[in-house]
């Protein structure tokens, strides 16, 4: 049996939010506005779909932080480290609503956001607009969820930067 590969070019809308707040202030604000994914939810997800899991997912925040990675420390390999953290942000229930129609959309669920220290002492937040990521799968149900995420993520990140 042989494998096949296909490629296509997709258009992605990239968003940059610039803030006069310091990296530490924006990071702190983001982490207070968007809670970390509940440990109990992680356990329930690991154990499989149950009634308790569904109840918890339906009551969960619209967005949660799944993971974070300190990219600023990596800069220490080449220069002085800076404040830079990448986040995976999303919602397990929302992800399942997307991937049930297009499993490939799991590439982008949860979403990635980076917050970093700008050269001027302020900070920047960058991310790809969810609807533009999900539009490539050609399923309006998936893109529609992406539009809702555009709003939710945009509000949270703008509030953190503001």
Would you name each region that the model predicts?
Residues 82-119:
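Short, internal acidic amphipathic alpha-helical interface segments
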Residues 1-58:
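Charge-rich, low-complexity N-terminal segments
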Residues 114-137:
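Beta-strand/loop substructures that line and gate deep hydrophobic ligand-binding cavities in soluble
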Residues 57-90:
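Helix-adjacent hinge/juxtasegments
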Residues 137-162:
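Well-ordered alpha/beta subsegment
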Residues 96, 105, 121, 130-132, ...:
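A structural preference for long, well-packed, hydrophobic secondary-structure segments
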Residues 33, 37, 105, 152, ...:
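Conserved short hydrophobic interaction patches
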Residues 25, 72-75, 94-97, 135:
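Short, surface-exposed beta-strand/loop "edge" segments at domain boundaries and coil↔beta transitions
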């Amino acid at each position: 049996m042989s494998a096949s590969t296909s490629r296509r070019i997709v258009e992605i809308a990239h968003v940059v939010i610039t803030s006069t707040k310091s990296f530490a202030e924006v990071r702190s604000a983001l982490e207070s506005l968007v809670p970390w994914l509940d440990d109990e939810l992680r356990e329930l997800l690991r154990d499989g779909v149950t009634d308790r899991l569904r109840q918890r997912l339906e009551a969960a925040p619209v967005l949660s932080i799944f993971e974070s990675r300190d990219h600023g420390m990596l800069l220490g390999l080449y220069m002085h480290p800076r404040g830079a953290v990448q986040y995976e942000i999303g919602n397990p229930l929302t992800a399942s609503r997307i991937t049930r129609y297009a499993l490939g959309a799991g590439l982008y669920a949860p979403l990635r956001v980076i917050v970093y220290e700008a050269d001027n002492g302020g900070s920047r937040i960058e991310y790809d607009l969810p609807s533009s990521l999900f539009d490539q799968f050609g399923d309006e149900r998936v893109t529609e969820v992406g539009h809702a995420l555009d709003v939710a993520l945009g509000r949270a990140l703008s509030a953190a930067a503001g």
